[in-house]
């Protein structure tokens, strides 16, 4: 497999070079990632779509996370990250259909590695039922939708769990309906401010 290279940045997001993805995570270089939240509106309710990460992922296995995300490779633009929607969810979207809602810095310590990201966050509105999505099964093993008002109460610690509904895929590729209450241990631990950026944009109607 061809080695993947990423552009690296200082803390002010000034370009300082190019390193392999392995070295970026080993040495904790800042790099860019594409995060896209798929939004589904049903009547007066608005839902965010969360993906369930594959159980063999090296980071946050089996946890629920942003609808679609990926690294921006060296020389790519942030908008090139739209390919992740196609690869992970089977969604054909054009860059001009996505709404850019901001950038947030995040830092994760994973074993001996340090993952420092400039997360470029986008919103994509899609009317399709999540059951129609085509998953990249070595990356994603399920999708759920969560209503944003309930999610906001959950993040503010006003409720202990949040209702999620969707499906999971087993090793044979069969889909099973999923309806359950999720708690904070079920989610990738993004900063509180990360989710606030997303919810504020949705509640302000972008």
Curated annotation (Swiss-Prot):
A matching Pfam family: NUDIX
Top EC category: hydrolase
GO molecular function terms attached to this record: hydrolase activity; metal ion binding
Sequence positions that bind Mg(2+): 84, 88
Record EC number: 3.6.-.-
Keyword Signal: no
TM region positions: none
Keyword annotations: Hydrolase, Magnesium, Metal-binding
Residue span of motif Nudix box: 69-90
Cofactors that this protein relies on: Mg(2+)
CDD domains, A to Z: NUDIX_Hydrolase
InterPro entries tied to this protein: NUDIX_hydrolase-like_dom_sf (IPR015797), NUDIX_hydrolase_dom (IPR000086)
Keyword NAD: no
UniProt superkingdom: Bacteria
Domain (Nudix hydrolase): residue spans on this chain: 29-169
Family the entry assigns: Belongs to the Nudix hydrolase family.
PANTHER family according to UniProt: ISOPENTENYL-DIPHOSPHATE DELTA-ISOMERASE
Protein name: Uncharacterized Nudix hydrolase CA_C0446
Native organism: Clostridium acetobutylicum (strain ATCC 824 / DSM 792 / JCM 1419 / IAM 19013 / LMG 5710 / NBRC 13948 / NRRL B-527 / VKM B-1787 / 2291 / W)
């Amino acid at each position: 497999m061809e080695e993947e290279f990423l552009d690296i940045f200082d803390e002010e997001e000034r370009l300082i070079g190019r390193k392999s993805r392995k070295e970026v995570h080993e040495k904790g270089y800042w790099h860019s990632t594409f995060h896209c939240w798929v939004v589904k509106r049903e009547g007066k309710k608005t839902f965010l779509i969360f993906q369930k990460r594959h159980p063999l992922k090296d980071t946050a296995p089996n946890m629920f996370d942003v609808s679609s995300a990926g690294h921006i490779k060296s020389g790519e633009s942030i908008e090139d990250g739209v390919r992740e929607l196609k690869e992970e969810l089977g969604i054909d979207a054009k860059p001009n259909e996505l709404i850019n809602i901001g950038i947030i810095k995040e830092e994760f310590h994973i074993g001996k590695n340090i993952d420092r990201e400039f997360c470029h966050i986008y919103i994509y509105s899609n009317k399709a039922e999540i059951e129609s999505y085509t998953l990249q099964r070595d990356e994603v093993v399920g999708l759920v939708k969560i209503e944003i008002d309930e999610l906001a109460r959950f993040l503010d610690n006003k409720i202990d769990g949040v209702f999620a509904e969707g499906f999971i895929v087993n090793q044979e590729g069969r889909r099973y309906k999923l309806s359950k209450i999720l708690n904070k241990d079920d989610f990738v631990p993004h900063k509180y401010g990360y989710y606030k950026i997303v919810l504020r944009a949705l509640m302000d109607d972008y």
